[in-house]
A protein has these predicted regions:
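Actinobacteria-biased recognition of intrinsically disordered, low-complexity terminal regions
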Residues: 1-20, 210-216
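Hydrophobic, aromatic-lined core segments that form the binding pocket/scaffold
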Residues: 12-181
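A generic "cationic amphipathic patch" detector
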Residues: 62, 147, 204, 214-216
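Generic intrinsically disordered, low-complexity segments enriched for polar/acidic and small residues
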Residues: 8, 172, 190-191
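Local cysteine-cluster metal-coordination motifs and their immediate loop/turn environment
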Residues: 187-209
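Conserved functional hotspots at enzyme active or ligand-binding sites that engage polyanionic ligands
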Residues: 184
């Protein structure tokens, strides 16, 4: 049978978001959030895409013992009318090497680095914020994974701890996992989501700062 065209259904190469294509995605993110296409929308768009990438790679590693080759030229994306970015990987193949290193190469090197460059250079979002977003996305991915497949903790949690202990995610926050209670993460940088009315993210550093302030 002929192989399906990956562009069917409106999918496009993810690599386009690491160049001028990021502008349209940030603009649409800002429209949906009501913030406009500025730093808040850019940070949120980067965080959302990082979440999808980590979820795909970590799930495969923890449940299937392999990390797929997610090269930007092989992975396709589309933006539905509502909800997060959708990803499509035609003809998946595994990356060689140990799982921790393969995860790092597939996501941190292959995607998060060029994405951070595209967002940071165009929207003046600091590298510290973008690294914190990437770490929050990873923790969010393992949180959802363990909610659905708690038996994966033995493989998934050490992988997350390894990734959070090395650049670019090192020193981005405090990660805790307790069996039966799940995972928690407190950032050391702000994702800027607090600028959306009445909103903060689940890992918000500002909540911690507020608790430390003396009451008057």
């Amino acid at each position: 049978m002929p192989r399906a065209d990956p562009s069917e259904g409106g999918f496009r190469p993810l690599a386009e978001l690491y160049g001028d294509g990021i502008a349209g995605h940030v603009e649409e993110t800002g429209r949906r959030m009501g913030t406009g296409p500025g730093r808040v929308a850019a940070s949120t768009a980067q965080l959302g895409l990082a979440s999808r990438l980590w979820s795909l790679a970590l799930g495969c590693a923890a449940l299937g013992s392999e990390v797929p080759d997610l090269g930007p030229g092989r992975l396709w994306w589309r933006r539905p009318s509502a909800g997060p970015v959708e990803l499509r990987l035609p003809a998946p193949r595994p990356l060689p090497g140990p799982l921790p290193e393969a995860l790092h190469r597939a996501v941190a090197v292959g995607h998060l680095a060029p994405l951070a460059e595209a967002v940071g250079s165009r929207y003046a979002v600091s590298p510290q914020v973008l690294r914190g977003n990437a770490a929050s996305a990873l923790v969010g991915a393992v949180r959802v994974l363990l909610d659905q497949a708690p038996e994966a903790a033995g493989r998934a949690v050490p992988l997350v701890e390894h990734l959070l202990g090395r650049p670019p995610l090192a020193h981005t926050g405090t990660f805790v996992h307790e069996e039966g209670l799940g995972v928690a993460f407190v950032r050391r940088s702000c994702c800027l989501f607090y600028r959306v009315p009445a909103e903060t993210c689940g890992d918000c550093v500002l909540r911690t700062r507020d608790r430390r302030r003396p009451r008057t």
